[in-house]
């Protein structure tokens, strides 16, 4: 079988103007970005406002191996399967970060014959949204340090009188806005800025700082959660970047940089329209990670897709304890649109990996034993699949399990898994997906069962309400969302929680940052752990995004490169074709 990029580069694609027209978009709704992608003007929503919403299908997964279990492949393949059944359908996915593209996982366009195309354009820059977010974010960083420098150089009173601006009196030790870049670079996690030659201060105030990956920026979350340009502007203005010497929050609005940040992101608020290999329209917008952010594509993209098609297929990052949980508890209450069906992706290798019988390490190849028949490992890993089925069902949604088939899978083990799921005393259906090898033809049974599931009545129930205290919300996610015994706040986190409550932020949602390798916060614990403690070492206020960000365990907001990064495989030939991208 050809490689992903070879399949994509030899595919016959439809011009984007035709894709958009068939979708119901007018010429003035789109701004073409070459022949096969276009920006969709957010103002199209005004024209579509009176149209009914279609069905929203949310794709999630069991606890994944480091290489993933095929959520995007299934998302794209399912959309293609629905289209082959004659349904009106679109897909919504996140824009890939170049960190993972050059790091461990490679690209995020799907794979095989279920890809978004052109995949090299999707995986590398696309229309520049992530770069715009990086620029806007670092503009705020520059504004913070410039303000500290000038106020301290002149003195607060002189600065205020000279510039007719209030002195913000930012405490340099309480700047909470790190810089960002769209690469995995562990060396930038902790840096010292503002260093000067002896006797000079021209480079600013020396202080400790650090970098996060752009996908972890609050601006990325804001882009994904904003409903229109005005909402984007207001959210950016609410961002707390530091605290002053009296312990009061300092916002981007206080720095008078929020407007310029929004201007920098003006084009980024418009989703990018692309297509699958079979011509299914696909909206690509925003790219928050699910382990260190809320892990879902944008509300704006969903809203446009739901107005234009009867079915919209989207995905939440990592397992159902991650992106799916955040879609239900953060995204859905804001969008006022809950999923109509949950599709849970499982693989034989992923179930075996959750048996706890094999060592797994990020950046390392999967053990060969995962690809061979192994009844003991398969049986031992079923607890994880059952946990994720129950987890999706607890939100009041019908669940369809999609068994993503790999070439080495045996029919005997597939049949065993099908029978096991079919015999569960739960509202769940199951089908094998061969989206990777067969495209839409490999998901026809899955598509039929998803249509059936979408016809069921749902009783969508998030884990918490806005009226609950922040502590109770954190506990709700840990206990009801993960099956933990309790949370355990560090002394620092306790102080931060008290501060946020005192400042009036108790109505915000909570966003847990933790390892995706386990339902718990310890990536070494596989299966369906119980009675564990969720340690929260630090809390961060994301007032613009509308949530409190809880750092659990040892999760990092700036990834590092593995021993053998994916960028080693990338090159370009004499004709300008990219090779080695997966």
Swiss-Prot record:
Its EC number is 6.3.4.3. It holds the Pfam family FTHFS. One of its GO terms (biological process) is tetrahydrofolate interconversion. This is Formate--tetrahydrofolate ligase. Belongs to the formate--tetrahydrofolate ligase family. PROSITE patterns: FTHFS_1, FTHFS_2. One of its GO terms (molecular function) is formate-tetrahydrofolate ligase activity. Gene3D superfamilies: Domain 2, N(10)-formyltetrahydrofolate synthetase, Formyltetrahydrofolate synthetase, domain 3, P-loop containing nucleotide triphosphate hydrolases. InterPro entries: Formate_THF_ligase, Formate_THF_ligase_CS, P-loop_NTPase. Pathway: One-carbon metabolism; tetrahydrofolate interconversion. It is an enzyme of class 6 (ligase). Keywords: ATP-binding, Ligase, Nucleotide-binding, One-carbon metabolism. ATP binds at residues 65-72. It comes from Aliivibrio fischeri (strain MJ11) (Vibrio fischeri). It catalyses: (6S)-5,6,7,8-tetrahydrofolate + formate + ATP = (6R)-10-formyltetrahydrofolate + ADP + phosphate.
